[in-house]
């Protein structure tokens, strides 16, 4: 039976890759709703190609722009806007599958709505689990939703794990691989001079600017550890991080009998997306087959926590529990935005997050509203810290 998709965040890199896979298999997948924040022109192009029933954007002005262009082209797609519209298309009877690819905390409410509606959820939004892991996973279980991870690392672990729960499958630990980003071998003393363009030049993956910066600081890997804790039900001390510069092995599962299972593939997000879309079947993703002889060598090393303090901060937040992970995520989003706008330097990202975690008292959240309140409080603190920070050095010519 054909799957009907709501694609949250269709104009981002995950959205592009998802629609590429969808276009290859029109007999398997159709699109009910596409959503974007303010990239109206790209959304119009997608709507004209995939003919969704509904399109959602962030504000009224963008909605008017998109609607006018679609009407002029003869499209019948209904254009909505605002946070509630995101929730509505995520729980609508018009779709059975929700691809959650909105970056940041804005993706939490629609992802949670999809879980409470019992949808098949392809999760690429880390924040739903980082901010409110217990609440989200309870909703998945209580409402019969199906959760399929799309992040390459978590999808790799999913493929290497038994279908039973981890505690019944003889699993010793899971190992998330990380490329190390663009600064793995750079002299630590020079990181203070890093520019946004340098931080966004990932050596292997094509990603958006925010997640590229998170990869450069390795905050992305820290968030993935927290995400893995909730998806697979393992404590933090059974989740390792391993630097693997080639990005060929996407993650590994270590078993009690000494076996280690790994999932390999070329670094292309269409592979995990196609796996999750078609699961339990396999379909062509448009990705070249891996040529191990050409790669010839795979290398590994332990992460340098002094070089990547954001990774250490994320692991600490997971250990502390409570609202710490939500505060970590909120402070990081504010700090990364400030860095991309050249209001703070690269190393100030970790310093800002650390200051917020040390200032905001930790507590056990009392429901989703409390999580969102902690998120807002952490954002205010981060903004205040950044406002007092010294201006970054003048960007050098490269």
Swiss-Prot record:
Sites where the protein binds NADPH: 11-14, 38-39, 125, 127, 208
Pathway involvement of the protein, from the record: Isoprenoid biosynthesis; isopentenyl diphosphate biosynthesis via DXP pathway; isopentenyl diphosphate from 1-deoxy-D-xylulose 5-phosphate: step 1/6
Annotated EC: 1.1.1.267
Pfam families given in the database record: DXP_redisom_C (PF08436), DXP_reductoisom (PF02670), DXPR_C (PF13288)
Sites where the protein binds 1-deoxy-D-xylulose 5-phosphate: 126, 152-153, 179, 202, 215, 220-221, 224
Family affiliation: Belongs to the DXR family.
Function: Catalyzes the NADPH-dependent rearrangement and reduction of 1-deoxy-D-xylulose-5-phosphate (DXP) to 2-C-methyl-D-erythritol 4-phosphate (MEP).
PANTHER family reported in the protein's UniProt record: 1-DEOXY-D-XYLULOSE 5-PHOSPHATE REDUCTOISOMERASE, 1-DEOXY-D-XYLULOSE 5-PHOSPHATE REDUCTOISOMERASE, CHLOROPLASTIC
Name of protein: 1-deoxy-D-xylulose 5-phosphate reductoisomerase
Species in which this protein is naturally found: Burkholderia cenocepacia (strain HI2424)
């Amino acid at each position: 039976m054909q799957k009907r998709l709501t694609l949250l965040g269709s104009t981002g890199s995950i959205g592009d890759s998802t629609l590429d896979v969808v276009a290859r298999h029109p007999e398997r997948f159709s699109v009910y709703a596409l959503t974007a924040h303010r990239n109206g022109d790209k959304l119009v192009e997608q709507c004209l190609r995939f003919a969704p029933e509904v399109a959602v954007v962030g504000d009224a002005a963008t909605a008017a722009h998109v609607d006018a262009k679609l009407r002029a082209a003869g499209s019948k797609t209904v254009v909505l806007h605002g946070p509630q519209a995101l929730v509505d298309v995520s729980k609508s009877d018009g779709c059975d599958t929700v691809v959650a690819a909105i970056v940041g905390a804005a993706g939490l409410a629609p992802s949670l709505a999809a879980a409470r509606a019992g949808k098949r959820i392809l999760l690429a939004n880390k924040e739903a689990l980082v901010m409110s892991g217990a609440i989200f996973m309870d909703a998945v279980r209580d409402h019969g939703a199906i959760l399929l991870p799309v992040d390459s690392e978590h999808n790799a672990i999913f493929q290497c794990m038994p279908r039973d729960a981890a505690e019944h499958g003889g699993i010793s630990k899971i190992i998330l691989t990380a490329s190390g980003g663009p600064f793995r071998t750079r002299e630590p003393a020079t990181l203070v001079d890093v520019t946004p363009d340098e931080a966004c030049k990932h050596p292997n993956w094509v990603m958006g600017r925010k997640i590229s910066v998170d990869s450069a600081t390795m905050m992305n890997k820290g968030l993935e550890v927290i995400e893995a804790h909730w998806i697979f039900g393992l404590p933090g001390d059974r989740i390792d991080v391993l630097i693997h510069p080639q990005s060929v092995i996407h993650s590994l599962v270590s078993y009690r009998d000494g076996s280690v299972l790994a999932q390999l593939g070329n670094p292309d997000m269409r592979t995990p997306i196609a796996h999750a879309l078609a699961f339990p079947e396999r379909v062509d993703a448009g990705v070249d087959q891996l040529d191990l002889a050409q790669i010839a060598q795979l290398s590994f090393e332990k992460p340098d926590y002094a070089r990547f303090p954001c990774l250490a901060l994320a692991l600490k937040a997971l250990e502390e529990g409570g609202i710490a992970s939500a505060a970590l995520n909120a402070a990081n989003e504010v700090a990364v935005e400030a860095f991309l706008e050249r209001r703070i330097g690269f190393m100030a990202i970790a310093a800002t997050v650390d200051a917020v975690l040390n200032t905001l008292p930790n507590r056990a959240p009392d429901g989703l509203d409390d999580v969102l309140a902690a998120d807002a409080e952490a954002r205010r603190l981060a903004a205040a810290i950044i406002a007092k920070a010294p201006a970054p050095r003048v960007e050098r010519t490269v």
